[in-house]
Amino acid sequence: MKIPTNMTMAYHDGDIDTNTSANPHLNDLIAVRYSRRQTLMGGLSAATAAVFGGMLLAGCDEDDPRRAVTVQAGASGATSAGKTVTLTGTVASGSATGVAWAQTGGPAVTLANANTATATFTAPSVAADTTLTFTFTGTSTDGIRSETSTSVTVSPARLDFTAVPKSLADVVAVPAGYSVTVLYRLGDPIATGVGAYANDGSDTNFARRAGDHHDGMSYFGLAATGSTPDANGNTRGLLVLNHENITQAYLHPNGATSTGGAIGAGGVRPESEALKEMECHGVSVIEISRSATAWSYVPASALNRRITPLTPMSFSGPVRGNALLRTRYSTDGTAGRGTINNCANGTMPWHTYLTNEENWAGYFRRQFGDVAARGGSTAKQNVSLARYGIRETANATTFNGNYGWASVVPADSANTLYARWNVTTTAATDATGDFRNEAFQYGWVVEIDPFDPASTPRKRTALGRMNHEGCEIGRTIAGVKPAFYMGDDAQNEYIYKFVSATPWSAADATATNRLAIGDKYLDSGTLYVAKLNADGSGQWLPLVFGQGPLTSANTTYPFADQADVLINARLAGDVLGATKMDRPEWTAVNPATGEMYCTLTNNSSRTAANVDASNPRAYTDPKKTGGQTTGNANGHVIRLRETGDTSEATAFTWDIYAFGAGSDLDATNINLSGLDATNDFSSPDGLWFGLPSNPTGNVTPVMWIETDDGAYTDVTNCMLLAAIPGRVGDGGTRAVTSTLGGTSNTVTTRIGKAPATTLRRFLVGPKECEITGIHSTPDGRSLFVNIQHPGENGGPTNITSSWPANQAGAVATPSRPRSSTIVITKNDGGIIGL
């Protein structure tokens, strides 16, 4: 209002107009303010939420039309967890010396470029729709501030890509908007002075080249020091990966050779070929980095390393020094040579890598007469060797183990690298005179420090001996003993859990003596085996000497001590009554809930007569090309919830997350999960959850399923699927009738909620491959995947795949295929899958 001037009394309170400047009145400011508009200048795309628009003034003097600025900052927008959100502000009038974005509400996010007009952030993980609020501020040349607010509503994470169709093409296919880079191939050199790979069978020196059959894999961020971990390193790191096996035919100019007979039937292998084949097994440690355009590996890095069946090993834990580990090479049973058939893996929070020895038994030769030499068929060692599949040959047969390495006659007669594959008793004295105990040196979990090339890998015997597929640690909670979950990958074998004797301490995640931390958590604890009941409950049965039937009085196998129990974990599981499963493969733990998932890849020996609640299907899966697969042909994924959600629990509940099946198979008894053309799969194998350092591992994590299949390959090559699973018990019970071989049997199983659109196909691989091994950078924006044995059914004169040479386009002439690691990135830089 105007101040009155017609005062009639002598009183003077000083309230008179002495301001003769040209500055505006309040009415002028109001007029200025209400002449402006709030506008929305953008929206949401599939990958990015962009918020623009309206304005709000912080104070009336900020509307000074000569000195103030007017800013616009956006109306409400919406997005989902993991998406990149762009906030765009504008200066609608006036001149600003600075602008800034700030968050004022909701779960805290990190604003990139907050002191510019355009700021970005990654939408956080949420369990329900959640609103975040932000303020955009502009400051005039006279220091007057103007600000306005906007909001973004974030919904829970969802898969946001179009499912990749099934395919028989010889190429890696990914969704639109994603790119594939081939990173690390069989034969790639990893040291200075090693030549490029010729890929014609002539190459040697695989101790300094990439091995074959890339499998389980972990990424470790590398700090600027070049030798220490960086848990947040997204552009430089160490990639550690297994080389499970070989495609023998492609490693030599004209395939593998032998003299005096066929390989595996008395033929003698050349030493040079056998050495190459051995060196192609094992593990790679390589440094990788990301430039502005792509990922590549660093061929001359000092951290590059191959670990092979020739690498010195150390034993740790309860079996170290046991008589059954003593050999001609290690007379005190504390050391060994090499690791082999390394399948899945484990990534430890103290930055070490666990590699796991799977199908190791087939590499050994055991000649006729060895059973008698060890005391007859009922002698303990013979019972043990038979239970692990190491049987003597028939009288008229000479089997030299997988690839015939035991047949090699080395140029150096003192060289025992090949003789050790013969576990026949030959010495007149004890086991230190031959390699009768060499098989007991395999079947273990092996821990590697990737940051120390001089370190000796340690075989962790407290985790038991079996066909170790993988070893996945559960959630680590301060003061709680961590658990490590494992599958024994063979038909009708068991699921195991090791609970450390030591409660978790968060400080150990940054310790510099990494293998010593492994000693702390992995050398002492309790190994358990799973028993699953028909009512959906289950128990972890302890493999502890002296408890229950695990004593020297046991008639199946008289256990001598705890070391004997661990060496013979399968026999211990037998007498405890563990549940036989349909080939337990990879394990993975949901980082948000702690629930453990395990792939049961398939089981050709499952019959209608022996189905049970946790392995409820036996059926015929016909092939379009003729023939059929029987048993549990397509496999399933089971999951367990620990009682009290604690890793220390000895009881659990379970259900089956999803059943593999073709979408065209019987929906009542086979395709129980209601799979369709976007997500039907067969033989689940690799399994991994996104990391909790990004939205794929928080609140509603993304689970990745890889396949290793033979039943559905008439329809599609192997694949990678993404899923956002629920929780144990989110479905119900289901009666399932199996009909096979003239027998029918009905059991009631527990099945999770049908996945529908929360499960979809993300990748299809090239011909004759397995999709296996998966990990990501901490930010979830680069996904590493292994393509194993493409073209495995061919050979030098019959090349059945040219991948990866043809990934960028057709090749003029066929190229020998190479197992390889690929990197998948999103073209807009976003988080993979979301």
Describe the function of each predicted region:
Residues 1-38, 45-55:
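N-terminal secretory signal peptides
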Residues 25, 155-834:
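Conserved small-residue
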Residues 66-75:
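Proline-enriched interdomain boundary motifs that mark the N-terminal boundary
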Residues 88-94:
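Acidic, Ser/Thr
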Residues 94-100:
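Solvent-exposed loop segments of extracellular immunoglobulin-like
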Residues 102-121:
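Surface-exposed, flexible coil segments in extracellular/virion-facing regions
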Residues 147-155:
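C-terminal edge beta-strand
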